[in-house]
């Protein structure tokens, strides 16, 4: 039986470096995935479940499972929660498609531009092995991300 993790990684790397890679991963995939997981799955679950967050969590779990790569699943689940929240707040898949496009484009660019040892390594490798710099960067990112989500939530309540 083939090693699924290595097979998925190999297929993704080949796709990133192919002529259709950007179209497939950054334009087509976000539209299709948002249509399926937010436009169909979440839209169906929201009116049928008592808890909005339970519906969002189920669609996020399905979204993460479809990515097939165990290393991607935790991030895909968290992204699925954010995308589900965006859909539940706006009733539209378009904000999710935009977020998904930006995310996939950044990952695509990193895969094309950064050396393979960085791409195949760990987060700490991006910081030259310096744990302090990595932790400070993550904390700094959270200081930007969390207030941004809070402000977005406030502004969406007013709308």
Set out the residue ranges of the language-model regions.
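Active-site His/Glu-centered metal-binding helix of metallohydrolases
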Residues: 31-36, 40-41, 69, 102-106
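Juxtamembrane helix-loop-helix connectors linking adjacent transmembrane helices
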Residues: 1-35, 42-48, 121-126
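Membrane-interface helix/loop boundary segments of multi-pass membrane proteins
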Residues: 32-58, 85-92
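Residues that define the loop-to-transmembrane-helix transition and helix capping
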Residues: 20, 53-54, 71, 93-94
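C-terminal membrane module of polytopic membrane proteins
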Residues: 101-159
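Membrane-interface helix caps and helix-loop-helix hairpins in membrane proteins
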Residues: 65-71
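Hydrophobic residues within alpha-helical transmembrane segments
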Residues: 28, 58-62, 74, 98, ...
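Hydrophobic, membrane-inserted alpha-helices
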Residues: 56-63, 78-82
